[in-house]
């Protein structure tokens, strides 16, 4: 391998916020070090399916983007395929920028479970799930943008009274499971989250948080806040339903933000984190990892550090991304500045509550099928929770992650 080059892989689009920011980071790296970057863009699926083989071979890159979480980065770390980054974290003070719940997805124990143990990955952006509001539709019916949970339910009721289904939902993929998890988080404490996500103890599936969330979804369906017909709706179609003005509200991720900015130019829309909750759905973005086989670990670490620099972080913010260390005053677009300020507030409160499907590799689909039964009324609250519990327990046992 040529000492004058470093091999970097990621799977972001060139015109997206991460793609633009990281291209800038590569340019700065080359200027600073005199080392040439050999960049290869891979597809997410290419890396997901072949990571272990690639990292075991001479073809491995020196630094690459990899998916956060137990079944992905955690698994590779536990197999000895990723470099332990503890010394670099100390050297560059990365834990000052990547801290609290953001750091959870960069640290893995010897079983590959996130949240404790050694550093194997470093993120430089984040994501959370927010409630998007079409202000034109709120104004049309004289409804205020909700500030509290009670306001939220009152607003949805007013839309229903006017013949409008308020929430754009879908249970074929993710939007509804994120809403369900947000309702869980609004009643959950840190211990519950640790038990659920990091297998620290048993999850009380018939307890207050999960029962409340599941009952609330059922209740909202019966009141017409969520359509019974959304069980087969995919995420893209739920997003389109908000973009084209069919539905006034959409609870989904900040990854839609850039699209709403470009595709809803004629609509007046706004957003906020979910009301009356200490925890929100969200996490760090994906992580930079350094393969154990890399011969250029010091250079790889230097590149990672550049992606956390002010210049790269501010560019990411100005490109519509969600950097973890940007200065809101350097962000020119007002709406993006609002987004970054909101996310910085979430980080300050250490409020990221992760995602509901993370604990097992099959739980995403299993949660959806349980929630489909809840929405179309074929199963009641207790049965749905028992089904979730069985699937969760099976998946956790199969993964062998619980001590």
Regions found by a protein language model. Give the residues of each.
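Mature extracytoplasmic/periplasmic domains
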Residues: 28, 81-87, 255-259, 286-361, ...
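Extracytoplasmic "Venus flytrap"/periplasmic binding protein-like
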Residues: 28-105, 136-147, 241, 248-249, ...
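Glycine-centered hinge/linker elements that transmit conformational signals in sensory
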Residues: 156-158, 198-230
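Extracytoplasmic/periplasmic solute-binding protein
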Residues: 110-124, 129, 153-202, 218, ...
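Extracytoplasmic/periplasmic substrate-binding proteins
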Residues: 11, 18, 24-25, 71-74, ...
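Extracytoplasmic/periplasmic substrate-recognition and gating elements
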Residues: 4-7, 27-32, 36, 56-57, ...
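Hinge/lid segment of periplasmic solute-binding proteins
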Residues: 71-129, 153, 179-181, 270
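Conserved C-terminal helix/tail region of periplasmic/extracytoplasmic solute-binding proteins
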Residues: 36-37, 139, 349-403
